[in-house]
Amino acid sequence: MKDSRKKGSRKKGKKGSLEAKGLKESRSEESRLAQGSLGGVRPETGDSAETEIRTENAPGCRAELLPEDFREKMRKLLGKEYEAYLESFEKPCHNGLRVNTMKLSEEDWNRLSPFQTEPVPWIENGFYYNASDEGSGRPSRHPYYYAGLYYLQEPSAMTPANLLPVKPGDRVLDICAAPGGKSTELGARLRGEGLLFSNDISNSRAKALLKNLEMAGIPNICVSSEAPEKLSEFLPEFFDCILVDAPCSGEGMFRREPDMIKSYRERGPEDYVPIQRAIMEEAVKMLRPGGYLLYSTCTFDREENEGTIRYILDRHPDMSLCSLPHRFGFAEGIGMPECVRLFPHRIEGEGHFAALLRRAGSGERPRRKDRTAQSGASLKLPDEALAFLSCLNLRRGGTEGLPGQVEEKNGKLYCLPPDFQDMKGAGKGIRFLRTGLLLGELKRGRFEPSQALAMALRKEEYPFTADFQAEDERVIRYLKGETVALREEEASWPDGSWVLVCTDGFPLGWAKKAGLNLKNKYYPGWRWQ
């Protein structure tokens, strides 16, 4: 039988079908959406290096390709701004990078940057870059990317993490975190204090999330792959700040990634609304009194945005909206002026929505007093591991030594954030990919430091370093996994020493000295391709 629908319109699902099946079915649907099997869209699209590379020079979507029902909805939503919105499809999309302030300041970046960049007005550490400028190469193919100095991210996608009022020492949950653009910013703002708990229900996406957090040098992490209701079972009222960057229909990304329109025709807003509301319900359970919850999407749909917020406010009288700044072309929420909407005809970025909620209560949880850091001398470890850890010269946040409890599990050493000890039975009930900073691995009495540790260190915190300028061809050789030759004056360390390889003062990974060579120990899964 022929499909009688108009060309360009979206296939309608059974409205409310997911809602009727309850949270359990919503979780199953969310899992499939997160893994892309239903063409599901995550707000962080354009947030990983791979996506950014793919879309750097993409032609974008033409307005005439938009589904008819979507165009009609936007005409009603925007009124006299509708034509300006359509005209934005004729303009180029914008590429962005966000400086990792865990490793350097915006001022340091401005002095160091090899790229032509312009600041993103609403993000202090956000910059636009021109993908067609081949003079300094692509940011995704520069040693500084491998050093974790910045994260490639669509400019509007930088907004949610920036709006959540995180401060050092907080316990922060990013509940739909992969691939990690927002988590890496949240971690940088914690400054290594408190706890960053990053979760994604898709195990494969959670692995990419872990890599990006390690590359950014965030030490105080827990990374899990769990359903939200499982997290809330073990972590009630545990977090100071929560980010819900929810799966959505992706209407705000049509201009940048036309392929999303096909997914939209199969699965639209009515399929995502019950999923979003189920996630938010679990998030509220994990928020402490006085804590903040930031909800964001990359869609324009009212039910997915203001409708979901209204749903939560009606069911939770102790939750209230906080006003977000309406600067730089940000629009107010529809019927909720406290929220913000980002439109591509108003800003140099794609479509986004954000709302900040606060839970009533005094909210100040007691801070742990037993935050003394461990030094290598106090640990019961094999001699080689003890000797290596004793070499570390860590002095951060008023402490000296490792910033947490060191534990051994299956031959691997981890430095656990102090707040991890307050999770009670969560360690046995939640599927963790990582708890704390992986220090290294014990192999038949030998100790091999981890790639994650290298990225979390500063050059001055380890005594044996080989520091090459970014233009030195040996940097690329190292990133490709090759042996690196040293000049006589560069090889002053004892043979067999673990050497921290750096570029312009920023760590890349480990090598072992063998004569006038550095035997490559760069993690194979991260190598330059």
Segments predicted by a language model, with ranges:
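S-adenosyl-L-methionine
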Residues: 201-235
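A short acidic, Gly/Pro-enriched loop at the edge of an enzyme's catalytic core
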Residues: 167, 233-243
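Mobile active-site "lid"/loop adjacent to the S-adenosyl-L-methionine
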Residues: 204, 241-281, 298-305, 326-328
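Conserved SAM-binding loop of SAM-dependent methyltransferases across substrates and taxa
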Residues: 179-192
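Conserved class I S-adenosyl-L-methionine
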Residues: 169-176
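Class I S-adenosyl-L-methionine
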Residues: 239, 292-295, 300-415, 422
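Helix-to-beta-strand junctions that scaffold the AdoMet/dcAdoMet cofactor pocket
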Residues: 191, 287-289
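Polybasic, low-complexity RNA-engagement segments
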Residues: 2-16, 21-24, 34, 54-110, ...
